[in-house]
Amino acid sequence: KKEGMGICHGDFNQHNIVFRSEYAAVISFDNICYDVQIGDLARFMRKILEKNNWNMGLGMEMIRAYSDKKAMSPYETKQLYLRLAYPEKFWKIANHYYNANKAWGFGRYLEKLEKIKAEEENREQFLAYMKHFAYS
């Protein structure tokens, strides 16, 4: 068995967690997969941090909360960093533009790219801080 590998939800985000007074439940296992388990944390963090302008304190608190339940190995820490560093949002927009017969119109693509550009400084600061832990 490879380090950190196991069954993953595959689309772990805030929309797939149901909170009740006595418990929380994870739903929608349509994308279940065998992967590095830290991948679920990376997907969850990306969604939350994008909505919170890559807030450093929030991101580090999410990592601490995860680590309190399951310690991350150096390999998993690097995996988390690399998965968050991948420019997923840019890739999705570029891929959509290339493959979707320009359904949105060029202005819509520019608008989405400008939004990514506005988030980039905070994203890069967060990633620089995280890189220190992943590669030290």
Positions of predicted regions on the chain:
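All-alpha amphipathic helical-bundle segments outside canonical DNA-binding/catalytic cores
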Residues: M72-L82
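Alpha-helical structural motif
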Residues: Q37-D40, E76, Y109, N122
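Active-site activation/catalytic loop segments of kinase-like enzymes and analogous catalytic loops
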Residues: I38-A71, L84-K102
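Short flexible/disordered coil segments
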Residues: D11-I17, F29, A71-M72, K115-E119, ...
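Active-site acidic catalytic loop and adjacent metal/ATP-binding pocket
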Residues: K1-G39
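ATP/Mg2+ or Mg2+-diphosphate-binding catalytic cores
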Residues: W91-S136
